[in-house]
Design a protein with these regions (language model features):
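Alpha/beta-hydrolase active-site loop
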Residues: 1-7
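Alpha/beta-hydrolase fold nucleophile elbow
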Residues: 8-18
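Active-site signature of alpha/beta-hydrolase-fold catalytic machinery across serine-
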Residues: 28-32
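Acidic catalytic loop of the alpha/beta-hydrolase fold
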Residues: 69-75, 104-105
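Short beta-strand/loop motif that positions the catalytic acidic residue
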Residues: 59, 64-67, 71
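A conserved short beta-strand
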Residues: 35-47
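Gly/Ala-rich beta-loop-alpha elbow adjacent to hydrolase catalytic centers
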Residues: 17-22, 26
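C-terminal catalytic histidine-bearing segment of alpha/beta-hydrolase fold enzymes
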Residues: 80-124
Length: 124
């Protein structure tokens, strides 16, 4: 929030982008913000404690989850589990992309999908 103030940005001008632990942090923070952000992109992470989210959710920004199907750090099963947890908490705009042949990382196809999502949510 301090950075948003410093940069003179409104929440609707922000898409949160996270990788691995950053995704986990983003999926914890974004739904609990009073002022909804434009969206969130999460690579190779998981939704921690989805049962708590149902009672703690305040805002439901659009969320794009991206995961490599060869990830040996955070299993690919974390993607559908996160999507399911978000939907149970009332999220309607949850999107997913699987990066074929990708381990715990960001591949060009995933980055392209993420950029298109961010452009769409920011109206660019």
């Amino acid at each position: 929030d301090a950075l948003m103030v410093d940069e003179d940005l409104l929440p609707e001008q922000v898409v949160l982008f996270g990788f691995s632990q950053g995704t986990m942090m983003g999926l914890h923070v974004a739904p609990r913000r009073e002022d909804a952000i434009a969206g969130m992109v999460g690579f190779s992470g998981r939704l921690m404690e989805p049962d708590l989210l149902v009672d703690e959710v305040i805002s439901r920004p659009p969320i794009l989850l991206i995961h490599g199907d060869q990830d040996d750090v955070v299993p690919i099963a974390s993607l559908p589990e996160a999507a399911d947890g978000l939907q149970k908490a009332g999220f309607q705009d949850v999107f997913a992309h699987v990066q074929k042949g990708t381990a715990h990382g960001i591949a060009s196809d995933g980055l392209s999908v993420a950029l298109a999502f961010m452009r769409d949510k920011l109206g660019l």
